[in-house]
């Protein structure tokens, strides 16, 4: 075994992980189940970040069936990766409940506290005692990047973001279930919150990602697309036109067909 070659290979692997979200996820979690779905989503997010950092203010609407890993990629790994590359930026993460948003917060912190992450991005850390002596918030609602301006805040959709500026805004499942999704009152309330609260907190060179299970054409995703033609839509059915499962390693075709038959 050539130790120098092994060290070189490891450094190359680390450098690739710093440049690619998909490779970053695999470096942090070698057991992560990769798929064409995960590759496509990560490639779109890599491009999204390029557009965001060049001032294009991108909007990405991502639709995928439940339990296929979209939240893992966008709400857990992406914020950690983003802070690694841009430790002075600010992330706002919203979901249908503050408890769920808090769980996402905890998962992001766990990733950023791992040895693997610290090797890739040593400048982006969550230490409670930074070298400059300034206290750093770290709880289930908010945390900061030590010795940098970066902050992560989370809240439930409909809740306040008063005083919080956001560069990368992530809305992950703004509606809890189909009953709420079909309610005109709920849809109106979410739209009003999006327009009057979420949008007003975005910075000049921001980017926003909206993920949701689609139950209605006039939901948040649909209205954003209607009002903002530049928004890009990335939609994945559980079973494609060729009759193949989206991620068979997670949900095989026979299971999806059973579910489809039950739902009608």
Predicted regions and their residues:
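N-terminal accessory segments
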Residues: 1-58
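Contiguous, well-ordered alpha-helical segments that form the cores/surfaces of helical PPI scaffolds
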Residues: 43-46, 72-84, 172
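Walker A/P-loop
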Residues: 56-77
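Residue-level preference for the first positions of well-ordered beta-strands
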Residues: 59-61, 90-92, 151, 168, ...
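Post-Walker A helix-loop "phosphate-sensing" segment adjacent to the P-loop in P-loop NTPases
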Residues: 81-90, 113-116
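Conserved nucleotide-state-sensing and coupling region of NTP-binding domains
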Residues: 94-158
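Conserved RecA-like ASCE ATPase "motif II neighborhood" in helicase/translocase motors
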Residues: 137-197
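Non-catalytic, compositionally simple segments
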Residues: 179-264
């Amino acid at each position: 075994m050539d130790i120098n070659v092994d060290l070189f290979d490891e450094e190359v692997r680390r450098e690739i992980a710093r440049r690619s979200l998909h490779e970053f996820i695999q470096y942090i979690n070698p057991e992560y189940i990769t798929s064409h779905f995960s590759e496509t989503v990560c490639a779109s997010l890599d491009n999204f970040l390029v557009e965001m950092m060049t001032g294009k203010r991108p909007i990405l609407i991502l639709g995928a069936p439940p339990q296929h890993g979209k939240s893992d990629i966008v709400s857990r790994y992406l914020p950690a990766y983003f802070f690694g590359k841009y430790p002075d930026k600010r992330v706002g993460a919203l979901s249908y409940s503050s408890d769920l948003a808090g769980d996402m917060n905890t998962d992001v912190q766990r990733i950023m506290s791992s040895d693997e992450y610290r090797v890739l991005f040593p400048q982006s850390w969550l230490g409670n005692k930074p070298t400059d002596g300034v206290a750093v918030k770290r709880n289930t609602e908010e945390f900061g990047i030590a010795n940098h301006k970066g902050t992560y805040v989370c809240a439930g959709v409909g809740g306040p973001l008063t005083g919080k500026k956001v560069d990368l805004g992530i809305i992950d499942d703004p509606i809890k279930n189909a009953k709420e999704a079909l309610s005109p009152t709920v849809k109106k309330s979410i739209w009003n919150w999006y327009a009057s609260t979420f949008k007003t907190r975005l910075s000049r060179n921001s980017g926003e990602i909206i993920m949701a299970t689609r139950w209605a054409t006039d939901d948040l995703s649909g209205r954003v697309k209607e009002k903002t033609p530049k928004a890009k839509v990335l939609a994945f059915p559980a079973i494609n036109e060729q009759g193949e499962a989206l991620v068979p390693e997670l949900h095989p075709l026979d299971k999806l067909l059973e579910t489809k038959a039950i739902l009608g």
